[in-house]
């Protein structure tokens, strides 16, 4: 069976999204999917809503990381986004590093991207590109949805949320299930309690 094209929309600060990204990477590495890495913003999603104080700095810093990712996208497309997101996510979600400008700059270097990508955290003109990507994620779902959004077979879905990220045969089985569900126009939701980290 040929690899299934997938668009993976993500906010880099979301720990659940990070786990799902590791799953879809496993699926792609096995040859079952080709992934186009795209951006979305929980900051844009929550505009006009009261954000608790403990999350505000994360949302602000997430916006700065998204600018760097938008610059990476302009520089080298989906492949550059994938490399930078992997470097950012490993630092933030695996090593517990702060999501600050120094960590972003280190991730940019690790991803083999030019320093201009790290400097893009201050480029407010990139906010329009982030917003356009976010709007594409919401259009794929057809409603408002958080991160991640996975689009395949002409449909977008929030999730799947996977903790921990499945590997090997389980990763492929889950992907096949998602692919099959995407082909059922009547399907809209399936949910259970989230696993703890």
Predicted regions and their residues:
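Structural alpha/beta surface segment adjacent to cysteine/selenocysteine redox centers
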Residues: 12, 18-105, 177-181, 189-193, ...
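Extreme N-terminal starter segment of soluble prokaryotic enzymes
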Residues: 2-7
């Amino acid at each position: 069976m040929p690899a299934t094209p997938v668009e993976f929309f993500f906010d880099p600060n979301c720990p659940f999204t990070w786990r799902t990204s590791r799953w879809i990477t496993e699926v792609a590495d096995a040859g079952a999917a080709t992934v186009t890495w795209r951006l979305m913003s929980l900051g844009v999603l929550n505009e006009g809503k009261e954000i608790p104080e403990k999350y505000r700095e994360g949302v602000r810093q997430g916006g700065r990381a998204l600018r760097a990712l938008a610059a990476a996208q302009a520089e080298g497309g989906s492949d550059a986004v994938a490399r930078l997101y992997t470097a950012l996510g490993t630092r933030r979600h695996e090593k517990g590093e702060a999501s600050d400008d120094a960590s972003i700059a280190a991730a940019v270097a690790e991803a083999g991207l030019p320093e201009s990508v790290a400097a893009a955290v201050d480029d407010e003109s990139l906010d329009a590109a982030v917003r356009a990507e976010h709007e594409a994620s919401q259009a794929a779902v057809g409603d408002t949805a958080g991160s991640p959004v996975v689009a395949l077979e002409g449909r977008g879905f929030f999730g799947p949320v996977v903790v921990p990220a499945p590997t090997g045969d389980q990763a492929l089985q889950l992907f096949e299930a998602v692919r099959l569900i995407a082909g059922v126009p009547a399907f809209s939701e399936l949910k259970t309690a989230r696993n703890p980290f």
